[in-house]
Amino acid sequence: MIMKRVLFTILCIVVAGIASAQYINRVFDYKPAPGQFINVSPWGTPAAIDGVIGGVYGNMTLGAFGGYVVFGFEAPVENDPQNPFGVDFTIFGNAYSNWSEPAAVFVMKDENGNGLPDDSWYQLAGSDHFFSSTKINNEITWENPGGESALDIPWSDNFGNSGLLEVNEFHLQSWYPSQEFFPEIDPLEYMLSGTFIDTKIDTSSQGIVKSYVRTFGYADNHARGVGDHLIPDNPYTSEIENSGGDAFDISWAINDLGEYVDIDQIDFVKVQSASMGSAGWLGELSTEICGAADVAPDPQLKGEDKVLVMKDLPLVLKSSSLQLESAFFIDGRVVPDARFDYAVSSDIAYVDEKSVLHVEESGILSITATLASNPQYTCTQECVVELSTGIEMASDDPTFSVFPVPATDFVNVKSVRPGIYHFFTGNGQICLSGELETSVQQIDVSHLTPGFYFLSVIYSDGKQIRKFMIQ
């Protein structure tokens, strides 16, 4: 009898937990930007709405910068500090390791009680929000190139920039939202406004494209985990511990002045593509979401609540100086008076008292930011430095390539002219050198530890560097 009572109690707890789970209940607005999945079901038509309601395995694209969706839950989502890691809901996308298509997230409380998202939006400020590269109220106007097939789409913004969203060979339909599926979008041009964050796209490895993950606070940024999707991940650590996806704390909300605001609960969520970039054969960066889930209280599930974030260095630094930026967060809120110390891995560079990096020659750099008040918190960034030698290589000069990537015991280097090669570790140490012959040369790297390396080839008229991986 006692055993039956115990089992009955456990069953009741489990059933109660399932019953309390909240998912997207209603989509109020879906207005995507152009993109490769637009006008294609199920990702890029209104049919995608049904997929994201009631679960976390739908398929909805928001397109390139500015595309958005507004949704709500059946009941308000409470800002509950008793939730795991203090987070209140999780949004799931189709991100994976080294591939992020980040979206900004906004929340709204139904203050007038009419059940509609017509009150004030508050952005949940993510890890990159306070960096100088982030643009608030970035407006992009998309122009319809016409026709029913894929054509490059012109765009311009309110900062004087313009360009083309370049189509690829894999999606041949028009990438501009069609009147058939999106009659409310102007068939000639339309403007989308939102927060832009600078993302880091790496195409240095042959056949491999990476869009590096932001630390926290953006949708379609972290991969889905294998754990219960109702048990969130800690947004302040890099490991995927539970559900994966991207967990959000309502306490990250800021107003139009960039000031944190206290909101006890929210009724509506807006997810909006926040990046702009081409990933080569993979197409444009475009946020996708699969669903969202409310988080239930569990005060026993706790973890790290502080994180140091350093603004991305360029993949290749071609200037002799660069302003470094870092931010320190406690419970996802930035600490405004935090101070940082910087250390560099090589004597080719130093950081001055104003956090400006000064570089004296080309090479490989690893820079570590440390919280001055607590050296436990650090963040490291790497980059290749290519300063001008005063001799410009002609545009038709051959380059060299490295394959396979990743390599194992051997790496092949293909070049049509001789040179001197150096293999560098991530911290700038030379670990292998030699003379590079013409055509294809096989180099033994079996003695090198798996990880990322840089191959520098010095020609008679300049230097070139490639990044590759050994596994």
Where are the model-predicted features located?
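A domain-level signal for the mature, folded cores of soluble proteins
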Residues: 22-101, 126-302
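Extracellular/luminal low-complexity segments enriched in Ser/Thr/Pro
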Residues: 354-362, 369
